Amino acid sequence: MSEYLFTSESVSEGHPDKVADQVSDAILDAILAQDPKARVAAETLVNTGLCVLAGEITTTAQVDYIKVARETIKRIGYNSSELGFDANGCAVGVYYDQQSPDIAQGVNEGEGIDLNQGAGDQGLMFGYACDETPTLMPFAIYYSHRLMQRQSELRKDGRLPWLRPDAKAQLTVVYDSETGKVKRIDTVVLSTQHDPAISHEELSKAVIEQIIKPVLPPELLTDETKYLINPTGRFVIGGPQGDCGLTGRKIIVDTYGGAAPHGGGAFSGKDPSKVDRSAAYACRYVAKNIVAAGLATQCQIQVSYAIGVAEPTSISIDTFGTGKISEEKLIALVCEHFDLRPKGIVQMLDLLRPIYGKSAAYGHFGREEPEFTWERTDKAASLKAAAGL
């Protein structure tokens, strides 16, 4: 019986790129709480002792950006120079401009050539769902995120007090080539920042027994499963001191772990007029409802947009041979049941709210948080009925 391997990774909230994402989304939320129609493109850079805030923001909101940045960094756990980054002591620079009026006229209703709210940029976005996990996400990315959430939980509640904020996990999974189903877990890689006093042996044992085994399905862990824990032997220097962090540099971690294509546009720090974010959320919503309806066990959708134009320039669907109806019929159903114009997406998913901070670590998809409207399967029944199944 032939097999193949597939790997995905996740990173913790203390990873420098994720620190940047969380600061950007915290600033977005602070603005949307006061001004839901704000235009925000908030970029963040974090390095040793430094946090730089830049981008384009047009808003009536009055926000203390420096305070928001410091509070976010502190909540993550960087509150001492001993950890490599200190929320209270780092320098924070603010360099925001306003959105270009040339872009604004294409996005604001009634101002551009297309009188509807146009897309904020050209681009292509993907959505994906499959039946490998309860939340209809690919196995490797779903469980990589859960490992990182477990690391954070044990760090914050004090059960493993030598843990520090920066960490990464990577899962390699064995699939059956004939059925496409997960057979077993081949390799677990987990690297975590730690207090210098802990030995590698003690750390490895605790990570395997208290982080990995409580999270991963025990029936998929075998005698052949390999565990690579802090493989360099030491991970004391981490976070923004170990590496410079930038918003938007973990786009595969944020989405499907490489199991589906990515259009290239990052999410964090962007208000919902940016289709990079809102249309990617809508695509996940569409794909998840198609799988939840039983119309396919695997579904990938691509949409594309032109700046200033409301209607998508293309919609395509691939069910990888698992569809119960043709892909042409699925596209027709999608057009009938989902409004994929930018304003329609915002209304359909109720996106003009301060809901984004939670999405900036541990994945934007496959988490049944009440704010994550794109994870609902409320269209599944109507799709199934319309398909005649």
Swiss-Prot record:
InterPro entries annotated for this entry? ADOMET_SYNTHASE_CS (IPR022631), S-AdoMet_synt_C (IPR022630), S-AdoMet_synt_central (IPR022629), S-AdoMet_synt_N (IPR022628), S-AdoMet_synthetase (IPR002133), S-AdoMet_synthetase_sfam (IPR022636)
The keyword Kinase is assigned to this record: no
The positions annotated for binding ATP are 15, 166-168, 234-235, 243, 249-250, 266, 270
- Pathway of this protein? Amino-acid biosynthesis; S-adenosyl-L-methionine biosynthesis; S-adenosyl-L-methionine from L-methionine: step 1/1
Catalysed conversion reaction:
L-methionine + ATP + H2O = S-adenosyl-L-methionine + phosphate + diphosphate
Class of this enzyme: transferase
Q: What transmembrane ranges does the database entry give?
A: none
Q: Partners and quaternary state?
A: Homotetramer; dimer of dimers.
What is the protein's name according to its record? S-adenosylmethionine synthase
What is the organism lineage in this UniProt record? Answer: Bacteria, Pseudomonadati, Pseudomonadota, Betaproteobacteria, Neisseriales
